[in-house]
Protein backbone atom coordinates (compact mmCIF):
# COMPACT_ATOMS: atom_id res chain seq x y z
CA UNK A 1 0.00 0.00 0.00
CA UNK A 2 1.14 3.56 -0.65
CA UNK A 3 2.17 5.49 2.47
CA UNK A 4 1.35 9.19 2.73
CA UNK A 5 0.20 11.82 5.24
CA UNK A 6 -3.58 12.01 5.65
CA UNK A 7 -5.44 15.28 6.05
CA UNK A 8 -8.36 16.22 8.31
CA UNK A 9 -10.80 14.40 5.97
CA UNK A 10 -8.56 11.30 5.65
CA UNK A 11 -7.37 12.21 2.16
CA UNK A 12 -3.81 11.77 0.95
CA UNK A 13 -1.86 15.03 1.17
CA UNK A 14 1.76 16.02 0.54
CA UNK A 15 2.35 17.64 3.93
CA UNK A 16 0.60 19.05 6.98
CA UNK A 17 1.44 21.00 10.15
CA UNK A 18 -0.43 21.00 13.47
CA UNK A 19 -0.01 22.89 16.74
CA UNK A 20 -1.61 21.29 19.81
CA UNK A 21 -2.92 23.61 22.52
CA UNK A 22 -1.88 23.00 26.16
CA UNK A 23 -4.41 22.27 28.89
CA UNK A 24 -5.72 25.71 29.85
CA UNK A 25 -8.04 27.26 32.42
CA UNK A 26 -10.26 30.06 31.15
CA UNK A 27 -8.95 33.54 31.95
CA UNK A 28 -9.01 37.06 30.48
CA UNK A 29 -6.76 36.04 27.58
CA UNK A 30 -7.88 32.53 26.71
CA UNK A 31 -10.75 30.08 26.68
CA UNK A 32 -10.28 26.85 28.59
CA UNK A 33 -8.81 23.90 26.69
CA UNK A 34 -8.65 20.18 27.35
CA UNK A 35 -5.11 20.03 25.95
CA UNK A 36 -6.15 18.11 22.83
CA UNK A 37 -7.43 20.99 20.69
CA UNK A 38 -5.20 22.08 17.81
CA UNK A 39 -4.80 24.29 14.77
CA UNK A 40 -4.05 22.71 11.40
CA UNK A 41 -2.42 23.72 8.11
CA UNK A 42 -1.80 22.16 4.75
CA UNK A 43 -1.26 23.75 1.35
CA UNK A 44 -4.68 22.72 0.07
CA UNK A 45 -6.40 24.44 3.01
CA UNK A 46 -4.07 27.41 2.50
CA UNK A 47 -4.37 28.87 6.00
CA UNK A 48 -3.82 27.89 9.62
CA UNK A 49 -7.25 27.00 11.00
CA UNK A 50 -8.80 25.79 14.24
CA UNK A 51 -9.53 22.10 13.83
CA UNK A 52 -13.01 20.81 14.74
CA UNK A 53 -11.30 17.62 15.95
CA UNK A 54 -9.40 16.71 19.10
CA UNK A 55 -6.10 14.82 19.07
CA UNK A 56 -7.49 12.16 21.41
CA UNK A 57 -10.42 11.46 19.05
CA UNK A 58 -10.36 8.70 16.39
CA UNK A 59 -10.34 11.29 13.61
CA UNK A 60 -8.23 14.17 12.37
CA UNK A 61 -4.94 14.33 10.48
CA UNK A 62 -2.72 12.80 13.18
CA UNK A 63 -5.06 9.88 13.86
CA UNK A 64 -5.80 9.19 10.19
CA UNK A 65 -2.11 9.32 9.26
CA UNK A 66 -0.90 6.83 11.86
CA UNK A 67 -3.99 4.62 11.58
CA UNK A 68 -3.26 4.24 7.86
CA UNK A 69 0.16 2.87 8.84
CA UNK A 70 -0.52 0.88 12.03
CA UNK A 71 -4.11 -0.19 11.35
CA UNK A 72 -3.59 -2.96 8.79
CA UNK A 73 0.01 -2.98 7.57
CA UNK A 74 0.96 -5.06 4.57
CA UNK A 75 3.95 -7.39 4.45
CA UNK A 76 6.15 -4.69 2.90
CA UNK A 77 5.04 -1.93 5.27
CA UNK A 78 7.29 -0.92 8.13
CA UNK A 79 8.11 1.88 10.52
CA UNK A 80 10.83 3.38 12.67
CA UNK A 81 9.54 4.98 15.86
CA UNK A 82 11.88 7.14 17.92
CA UNK A 83 11.51 9.27 21.03
CA UNK A 84 13.87 10.39 23.80
CA UNK A 85 11.02 9.47 26.19
CA UNK A 86 9.61 6.16 24.97
CA UNK A 87 6.05 4.94 25.66
CA UNK A 88 5.57 2.27 28.30
CA UNK A 89 5.17 -0.58 25.81
CA UNK A 90 8.75 -0.05 24.60
CA UNK A 91 9.53 -1.85 27.87
CA UNK A 92 13.04 -0.49 28.39
CA UNK A 93 14.79 2.47 29.96
CA UNK A 94 15.58 5.68 28.11
CA UNK A 95 19.19 6.33 27.07
CA UNK A 96 20.08 9.98 27.72
CA UNK A 97 23.19 9.78 25.51
CA UNK A 98 21.02 9.35 22.41
CA UNK A 99 19.33 12.16 20.52
CA UNK A 100 16.69 14.53 21.86
CA UNK A 101 14.47 13.53 18.95
CA UNK A 102 10.87 12.45 18.40
CA UNK A 103 9.17 11.11 15.32
CA UNK A 104 7.94 8.36 13.03
CA UNK A 105 9.31 7.23 9.69
CA UNK A 106 6.83 4.90 7.97
CA UNK A 107 7.45 3.23 4.62
CA UNK A 108 6.18 0.69 2.14
CA UNK A 109 8.73 -1.11 -0.01
CA UNK A 110 6.28 -2.33 -2.67
CA UNK A 111 5.03 1.18 -3.48
CA UNK A 112 8.41 2.87 -2.77
CA UNK A 113 6.57 5.39 -0.58
CA UNK A 114 7.18 6.79 2.88
CA UNK A 115 6.28 9.54 5.32
CA UNK A 116 8.09 11.38 8.08
CA UNK A 117 6.24 12.69 11.12
CA UNK A 118 8.45 14.92 13.27
CA UNK A 119 6.86 16.01 16.56
CA UNK A 120 7.59 17.17 20.11
CA UNK A 121 5.28 14.86 22.13
CA UNK A 122 7.05 12.64 24.70
CA UNK A 123 6.03 8.96 24.93
CA UNK A 124 4.39 9.00 21.49
CA UNK A 125 3.61 7.02 19.32
CA UNK A 126 2.77 3.35 19.85
CA UNK A 127 1.57 0.93 17.14
CA UNK A 128 -0.18 -1.37 19.61
CA UNK A 129 -1.50 0.87 22.40
CA UNK A 130 -4.15 3.37 21.26
CA UNK A 131 -4.45 6.80 22.74
CA UNK A 132 -2.22 9.78 23.29
CA UNK A 133 -0.06 10.95 26.22
CA UNK A 134 -0.27 13.98 28.48
CA UNK A 135 -2.37 16.95 27.34
CA UNK A 136 -0.55 19.42 29.60
CA UNK A 137 1.70 21.29 27.15
CA UNK A 138 1.65 22.76 23.66
CA UNK A 139 3.19 20.49 20.99
CA UNK A 140 4.02 20.75 17.27
CA UNK A 141 3.74 18.20 14.45
CA UNK A 142 4.99 18.23 10.85
CA UNK A 143 4.21 15.36 8.48
CA UNK A 144 5.78 15.00 5.01
CA UNK A 145 5.40 12.58 2.10
CA UNK A 146 8.61 10.94 0.85
CA UNK A 147 9.79 8.39 -1.65
CA UNK A 148 11.69 5.42 -0.27
CA UNK A 149 15.09 6.63 -1.51
CA UNK A 150 14.67 9.99 0.23
CA UNK A 151 13.61 8.26 3.44
CA UNK A 152 16.84 6.29 3.23
CA UNK A 153 18.94 9.45 2.89
CA UNK A 154 17.23 10.94 5.93
CA UNK A 155 17.82 7.74 7.90
CA UNK A 156 21.53 7.87 7.04
CA UNK A 157 21.74 11.44 8.32
CA UNK A 158 19.90 10.47 11.51
CA UNK A 159 22.29 7.60 12.23
CA UNK A 160 25.29 9.95 12.23
CA UNK A 161 23.81 13.14 13.66
CA UNK A 162 20.45 13.07 15.45
CA UNK A 163 21.10 9.49 16.70
CA UNK A 164 17.49 8.82 17.73
CA UNK A 165 16.35 6.36 20.38
CA UNK A 166 14.48 3.81 18.23
CA UNK A 167 11.90 1.44 19.69
CA UNK A 168 9.44 -1.20 18.41
CA UNK A 169 10.63 -1.06 14.78
CA UNK A 170 8.99 -3.05 12.01
CA UNK A 171 11.42 -3.58 9.13
CA UNK A 172 8.87 -4.70 6.52
CA UNK A 173 11.38 -6.80 4.60
CA UNK A 174 14.05 -4.09 4.28
CA UNK A 175 17.35 -5.19 2.80
CA UNK A 176 19.95 -5.30 5.54
CA UNK A 177 22.13 -2.88 3.54
CA UNK A 178 19.39 -0.23 3.62
CA UNK A 179 20.03 2.92 5.71
CA UNK A 180 16.51 2.50 7.07
CA UNK A 181 17.39 -0.96 8.36
CA UNK A 182 20.67 0.35 9.79
CA UNK A 183 18.73 2.94 11.80
CA UNK A 184 16.90 0.13 13.63
CA UNK A 185 20.22 -1.34 14.78
CA UNK A 186 22.58 -0.13 17.56
CA UNK A 187 24.12 3.18 16.53
CA UNK A 188 27.80 4.05 16.24
CA UNK A 189 28.71 5.67 19.56
CA UNK A 190 32.03 6.87 18.09
CA UNK A 191 30.44 8.86 15.25
CA UNK A 192 32.28 12.19 14.81
CA UNK A 193 30.86 15.26 16.51
CA UNK A 194 29.69 17.49 13.72
CA UNK A 195 26.67 19.12 12.11
CA UNK A 196 24.90 18.66 8.81
CA UNK A 197 22.35 20.21 6.47
CA UNK A 198 20.55 17.95 3.99
CA UNK A 199 18.27 19.22 1.22
CA UNK A 200 15.39 17.04 0.01
CA UNK A 201 11.94 17.27 -1.57
CA UNK A 202 8.58 15.74 -0.74
CA UNK A 203 6.89 13.50 -3.29
CA UNK A 204 4.95 16.60 -4.31
CA UNK A 205 8.19 18.45 -5.07
CA UNK A 206 8.24 20.84 -2.09
CA UNK A 207 11.84 21.60 -1.02
CA UNK A 208 12.93 21.12 2.58
CA UNK A 209 16.17 21.24 4.53
CA UNK A 210 17.05 19.09 7.55
CA UNK A 211 19.53 20.79 9.84
CA UNK A 212 21.03 18.44 12.43
CA UNK A 213 23.84 18.04 14.95
CA UNK A 214 25.59 15.23 16.76
CA UNK A 215 25.78 15.23 20.58
CA UNK A 216 29.56 15.75 20.34
CA UNK A 217 29.23 18.97 18.34
CA UNK A 218 29.04 20.93 21.59
CA UNK A 219 27.33 24.17 20.54
CA UNK A 220 23.83 25.61 20.70
CA UNK A 221 21.75 24.12 17.91
CA UNK A 222 19.47 27.07 17.20
CA UNK A 223 21.95 29.85 17.78
CA UNK A 224 25.11 28.46 16.21
CA UNK A 225 23.68 26.24 13.48
CA UNK A 226 20.12 26.99 12.37
CA UNK A 227 20.39 30.79 12.23
CA UNK A 228 23.74 30.81 10.39
CA UNK A 229 22.58 28.06 7.99
CA UNK A 230 19.49 30.08 7.06
CA UNK A 231 21.48 33.35 7.20
CA UNK A 232 18.85 35.07 9.32
CA UNK A 233 17.88 36.18 12.81
CA UNK A 234 15.27 33.96 14.45
CA UNK A 235 12.47 33.83 16.98
CA UNK A 236 12.30 30.38 18.57
CA UNK A 237 9.81 28.60 20.82
CA UNK A 238 11.22 25.62 22.75
CA UNK A 239 11.00 24.03 26.17
CA UNK A 240 13.20 26.10 28.51
CA UNK A 241 13.95 24.67 31.94
CA UNK A 242 17.56 25.69 32.49
CA UNK A 243 20.38 27.99 31.43
CA UNK A 244 19.81 29.59 28.02
CA UNK A 245 22.53 30.32 25.43
CA UNK A 246 23.20 33.97 24.51
CA UNK A 247 21.27 35.80 21.82
CA UNK A 248 24.30 36.45 19.61
CA UNK A 249 25.68 33.37 17.87
CA UNK A 250 29.33 32.42 17.49
CA UNK A 251 29.72 34.20 14.14
CA UNK A 252 28.84 37.48 15.84
CA UNK A 253 26.19 38.24 13.23
CA UNK A 254 22.95 36.31 13.73
CA UNK A 255 20.66 36.53 16.75
CA UNK A 256 18.13 34.10 18.20
CA UNK A 257 15.37 35.33 20.51
CA UNK A 258 13.13 33.15 22.65
CA UNK A 259 9.37 33.53 22.30
CA UNK A 260 7.66 34.38 25.58
CA UNK A 261 3.93 34.33 24.79
CA UNK A 262 1.82 32.49 22.20
CA UNK A 263 -1.59 33.66 21.02
CA UNK A 264 -3.79 31.86 18.50
CA UNK A 265 -6.75 34.25 18.68
CA UNK A 266 -5.99 36.03 15.40
CA UNK A 267 -6.09 32.62 13.72
CA UNK A 268 -9.67 32.14 14.88
CA UNK A 269 -8.70 29.89 17.78
CA UNK A 270 -9.56 31.28 21.25
CA UNK A 271 -6.40 30.28 23.11
CA UNK A 272 -3.29 32.01 24.41
CA UNK A 273 -0.58 30.84 26.79
CA UNK A 274 2.94 31.65 28.08
CA UNK A 275 5.95 29.68 26.90
CA UNK A 276 6.08 27.91 30.27
CA UNK A 277 3.07 25.88 29.09
CA UNK A 278 4.59 25.00 25.75
CA UNK A 279 6.75 21.98 24.87
CA UNK A 280 6.85 22.68 21.11
CA UNK A 281 10.11 23.23 19.22
CA UNK A 282 9.65 25.62 16.32
CA UNK A 283 11.12 28.81 14.96
CA UNK A 284 10.75 31.44 12.27
CA UNK A 285 13.27 33.71 10.62
CA UNK A 286 12.69 37.44 10.67
CA UNK A 287 12.94 37.51 6.85
CA UNK A 288 12.64 35.16 3.86
CA UNK A 289 9.64 33.10 5.12
CA UNK A 290 11.62 30.28 6.76
CA UNK A 291 9.69 28.04 9.17
CA UNK A 292 11.47 25.45 11.33
CA UNK A 293 9.79 22.55 13.12
CA UNK A 294 12.12 20.47 15.24
CA UNK A 295 12.65 18.34 18.31
CA UNK A 296 15.52 19.90 20.27
CA UNK A 297 15.40 22.73 22.81
CA UNK A 298 17.39 25.94 23.16
CA UNK A 299 19.13 25.21 26.47
CA UNK A 300 22.79 24.80 27.34
CA UNK A 301 22.17 21.19 28.46
CA UNK A 302 20.92 20.33 24.96
CA UNK A 303 24.38 21.00 23.54
CA UNK A 304 25.19 17.45 24.68
CA UNK A 305 22.29 15.88 22.75
CA UNK A 306 21.84 15.14 19.09
CA UNK A 307 18.82 16.62 17.34
CA UNK A 308 17.51 18.53 14.38
CA UNK A 309 14.87 20.65 12.71
CA UNK A 310 13.09 20.66 9.36
CA UNK A 311 13.34 24.06 7.66
CA UNK A 312 11.19 25.19 4.75
CA UNK A 313 9.96 28.38 3.12
CA UNK A 314 6.19 28.70 3.30
CA UNK A 315 4.90 32.30 3.16
CA UNK A 316 1.39 31.44 4.40
CA UNK A 317 2.50 29.39 7.38
CA UNK A 318 5.29 31.86 8.16
CA UNK A 319 2.80 34.73 8.10
CA UNK A 320 0.47 32.86 10.45
CA UNK A 321 3.29 32.16 12.89
CA UNK A 322 4.72 35.66 12.64
CA UNK A 323 2.43 38.44 11.47
CA UNK A 324 -0.71 37.16 13.16
CA UNK A 325 0.86 37.85 16.53
CA UNK A 326 1.86 34.41 17.73
CA UNK A 327 4.87 36.30 19.03
CA UNK A 328 2.90 38.85 21.02
CA UNK A 329 3.30 40.87 24.17
CA UNK A 330 1.82 39.71 27.44
CA UNK A 331 -1.40 41.54 28.35
CA UNK A 332 -0.88 45.28 28.72
CA UNK A 333 2.40 45.36 26.76
CA UNK A 334 3.07 46.64 23.25
CA UNK A 335 4.86 44.64 20.55
CA UNK A 336 7.98 46.76 21.06
CA UNK A 337 7.86 46.13 24.81
CA UNK A 338 7.45 42.40 24.24
CA UNK A 339 10.48 42.21 21.97
CA UNK A 340 12.46 44.29 24.46
CA UNK A 341 11.45 41.79 27.15
CA UNK A 342 12.62 38.89 24.99
CA UNK A 343 15.98 40.57 24.40
CA UNK A 344 16.36 41.41 28.08
CA UNK A 345 16.05 37.72 28.91
CA UNK A 346 19.51 37.19 27.45
CA UNK A 347 21.34 40.46 26.96
CA UNK A 348 23.09 42.01 29.99
CA UNK A 349 22.24 45.57 30.96
CA UNK A 350 24.63 48.12 29.53
Swiss-Prot record:
Keywords: Endonuclease, Hydrolase, Nuclease. Coiled coil: none annotated. Pfam families: DNase_II. Its EC number is 3.1.-.-. It comes from the Bacteria. GO terms for molecular function: deoxyribonuclease II activity. InterPro entries: DNase_II (IPR004947). The keyword Nuclease applies. The keyword Cell membrane does not apply. Belongs to the DNase II family. Unlike their eukaryotic orthologs the putative Burkholderia deoxyribonuclease-2 are probably not secreted from the cell, as they do not have a signal sequence. This is Putative deoxyribonuclease-2.
Amino acid sequence: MAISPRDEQNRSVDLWFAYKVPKLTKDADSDSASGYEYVYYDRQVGAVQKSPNLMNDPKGALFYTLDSVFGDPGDTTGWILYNDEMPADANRSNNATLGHTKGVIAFDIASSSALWLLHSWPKYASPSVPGVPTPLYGQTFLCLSLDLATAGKLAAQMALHQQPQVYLPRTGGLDHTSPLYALTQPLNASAPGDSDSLDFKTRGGVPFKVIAKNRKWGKDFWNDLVGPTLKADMYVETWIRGKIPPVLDSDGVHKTYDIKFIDLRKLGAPWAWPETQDHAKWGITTTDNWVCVGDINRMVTQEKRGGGTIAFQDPKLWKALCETDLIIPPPGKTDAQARAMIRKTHEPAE
